[in-house]
Amino acid sequence: MKTLLLTLVVVTIICLDLGYTEMCNMCVRPYPFMSSCCPEGQDRCYKSYWVNENGKQKKYHGKYPVILERGCVTACTGPGSGSIYNLYTCCPTNRCGSSSTSG
């Protein structure tokens, strides 16, 4: 019984990873989405959008932002970084990267 309990505790700790590993949704244009652990040192998730000449996110059928890429980065350079037609936004949560327009 003690062995079983010890095994369950060890498996739980390994599976939970003690909450230190960031998981980011990865996107291969345009789909499928998959969650993947970020490499060591890259602890922020980001989303990359297409933007128009005014810096506004381009929408698909007027509803959803066109997300080009999602992944892990070492540090965020701040909202709105990237080129004139490509906007990078860091996400505030683990496994972020849904189709919502908020970071």
From Swiss-Prot:
Signal sequence: where?
A: 1-21
Q: Where in the cell is it found?
A: Secreted
Report the superkingdom from the record: Eukaryota
* Record's keyword terms, sorted: Disulfide bond, G-protein coupled acetylcholine receptor impairing toxin, G-protein coupled receptor impairing toxin, Neurotoxin, Postsynaptic neurotoxin, Secreted, Signal, Toxin
- What do the Gene Ontology cellular component annotations say? extracellular region
Q: Is Ion transport set as a keyword in this record?
A: no
Q: Could you tell me what this protein does?
A: This toxin inhibits the binding of [3H]quinuclidinyl benzilate to the M2 muscarinic acetylcholine (mAchR) receptor subtype (CHRM2).
From the Swiss-Prot or TrEMBL record, give the protein name.
Muscarinic toxin BM14
